[in-house]
């Protein structure tokens, strides 16, 4: 408790040194005015006293606000020592190398394991690029919107102040920087705590790594941070990146930034460790956000954060739209659902990004949103509501169009197609109802179901009519032929009648009979009325006659009398 009070008093004394000097000036002016008796001199001294007094009041109010907000002084980060010789192996410490710092020479232990593990982090290292050198700057030469971000006493990255369409001011930086538990903003040696500030928008994609944080206005005003505007990057633009060891020891580097796709930027600008989240400035406007390096390609990488806000159309206002028009003539254009499908059929690959729950798909020069594809897939109907989103209670007004088949239409106040079957069989007389003029049925499925039901009923009625007419009609030719066939003798035998046995067939032929001997001709068929077929009774008569003739031709055993007659 006592330590915290002493620390606060010390910080108040450090920040109030200018106020004490102003108060001393006021006292000296007042004493000089008291020792003079000349009215003009007294008037001049009074004006001077009022000016100094106003100066003191303003300084005291500013220091009081800083004290309330918890403003503290930035801890100056010492410059690193430089290695001036080759590392050698020491059995006691491992690899050591001679270094120099502040004019003094000493040995530095080199942690080889830490260096090897750090070298595997390909996406977070920074790179020095050819023809892009770091230039030292004074803190007053840096952009007004640039701030340093601290995690307690450790510099984690950089950010900037931008304004949204609602007038709210936001902190823009890289998401991986914000995830290091940023606790303070720092500008010109002063730090302001910002713990607990809410996130407005963010994207965790490696190519679109940014976060938008809502910071109170008094925090910006205490540090004297200005507001920057967002502009869309051209296809190839010269940009400047700022960074440093702290908010007072800063550097800048200039190079060329190019677009790889609507969201991905590659820069040929030299950066060092701790520069992540630093804006890419082009003529005092922010056109990108530095993320890290791509060692395999020898370039640094950044994101086109202005394009992200332009696509989602909220959070931040993007200015200077003529640099990146929405028309098809621009370097990147928005696709509709039909064109997007054509691009997929052509084999063009799209990269998917997620910006605060909004899905965006981009190719090298084109982009679209999942919401636009969904809206195009489900076009609203006449009621203004998408068909897929309509409820069972919702009703849609449809145009009345008669169907193109006989007696089509539904009656008012009745189920669809329930009364289309208007014919009934009444003692062979068909009664037909009037033909409706229009069909007021809404669902097409109901119409088809009713039509199928009607066809089934009509088929059943026709079948019943045909069956009744075949049983009851007495004048048709078919009935007369049927009666005549029933009057003839039938070849079918009663169940109790035994089957007639055929005479046994002789196994040897008569010597007197010739092989060509024919039996008696069958009885001639009696001619009946034309068109009448032979009856089964006539066939049975012929079969009995043929059996009798066959039994007469079988001779008895040969005798000598017949043999002598033959020889004669």
UniProtKB/Swiss-Prot annotation:
UniProt modified residues of type Phosphothreonine: 339
Protein name: Polyprotein P2A
InterPro entries xref list: Peptidase_S1_PA (IPR009003), Peptidase_S1_PA_chymotrypsin (IPR043504), Peptidase_S39B_luteovirus (IPR000382)
Active-site feature positions: 176, 209, 276
GO BP terms, alphabetized: proteolysis; viral translational frameshifting
UniProt site (Interacts with viral RNA (covalent)): 324
Biased amino acid composition, Polar residues: 419-435, 469-478, 507-516, 554-568
Single GO cellular component term: membrane
Protein's UniProt keywords contain Phosphoprotein: yes
């Amino acid at each position: 408790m006592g330590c915290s009070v002493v620390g606060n008093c010390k910080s108040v004394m450090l920040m109030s040194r200018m106020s004490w000097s102003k108060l001393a000036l006021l006292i000296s002016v007042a004493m000089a005015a008291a020792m003079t008796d000349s009215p003009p001199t007294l008037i001049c001294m009074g004006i001077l006293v009022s000016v100094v007094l106003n100066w003191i009041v303003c300084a005291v109010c500013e220091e009081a606000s800083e004290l309330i907000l918890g403003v503290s002084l930035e801890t100056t980060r010492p410059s690193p020592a430089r290695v001036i010789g080759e590392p050698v192996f020491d059995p006691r410490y491992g690899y050591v190398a001679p270094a120099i710092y502040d004019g003094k020479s000493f040995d530095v232990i080199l942690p080889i394991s830490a260096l090897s593990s750090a070298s595997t982090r390909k996406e977070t290292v920074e790179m020095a690029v050819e023809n892009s050198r770091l230039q030292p700057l004074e803190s007053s030469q840096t952009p007004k919107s640039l701030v340093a971000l601290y995690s307690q006493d450790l510099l984690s990255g950089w950010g900037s102040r931008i304004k949204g369409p609602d007038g709210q001011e936001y902190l823009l930086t890289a998401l991986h920087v914000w995830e290091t538990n940023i606790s303070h903003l720092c500008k010109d040696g002063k730090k302001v705590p910002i713990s607990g500030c809410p996130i407005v928008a963010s994207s965790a994609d490696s190519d679109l790594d940014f976060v938008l944080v809502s910071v109170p206005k008094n925090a910006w005003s205490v540090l004297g941070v200005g507001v920057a505007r967002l502009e869309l990057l051209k296809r190839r633009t010269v940009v400047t990146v700022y960074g440093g060891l702290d908010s007072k020891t800063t550097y800048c580097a200039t190079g060329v930034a190019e677009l790889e796709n609507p969201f991905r930027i590659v820069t040929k600008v030299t950066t060092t460790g701790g520069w992540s989240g630093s804006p890419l400035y082009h003529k005092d406007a922010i056109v990108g956000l530095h993320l890290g390096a791509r060692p395999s390609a020898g370039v640094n990488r950044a994101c086109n954060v202005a394009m992200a806000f332009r696509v989602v159309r909220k959070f931040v206002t993007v200015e200077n739209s003529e640099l990146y028009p929405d028309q098809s003539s621009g370097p990147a254009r928005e696709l509709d659902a039909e064109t997007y499908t054509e691009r997929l059929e052509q084999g063009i690959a799209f990269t998917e990004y997620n910006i605060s729950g909004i899905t965006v798909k981009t190719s090298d020069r084109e982009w679209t949103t999942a919401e636009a594809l969904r809206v195009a897939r489900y076009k609203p109907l006449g009621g203004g509501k998408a068909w897929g989103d309509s409820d069972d209670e919702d009703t849609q007004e449809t145009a009345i169009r008669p169907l193109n088949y006989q007696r089509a239409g539904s009656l008012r106040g009745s189920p669809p197609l329930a009364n289309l079957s208007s014919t009934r069989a009444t003692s062979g007389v068909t009664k037909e109802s009037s033909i409706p003029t229009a069909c007021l049925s809404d669902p097409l499925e109901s119409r088809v179901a009713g039509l199928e039901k009607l066809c089934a009923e009509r088929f059943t009625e026709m079948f019943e009519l045909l069956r009744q007419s075949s049983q009851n009609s007495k004048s048709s030719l078919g009935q007369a032929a049927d009666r005549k066939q029933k009057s003839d003798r039938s070849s079918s035998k009663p169940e109790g009648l035994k089957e007639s046995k055929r005479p046994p067939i002789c196994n040897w032929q008569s010597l007197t009979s010739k092989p060509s001997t024919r039996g008696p001709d069958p009885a001639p068929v009696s001619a009946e009325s034309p068109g009448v077929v032979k009856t089964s009774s006539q066939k049975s008569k012929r079969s009995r006659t043929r059996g009798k003739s066959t039994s007469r031709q079988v001779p008895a055993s040969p005798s000598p009398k017949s043999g002598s007659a033959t020889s004669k």
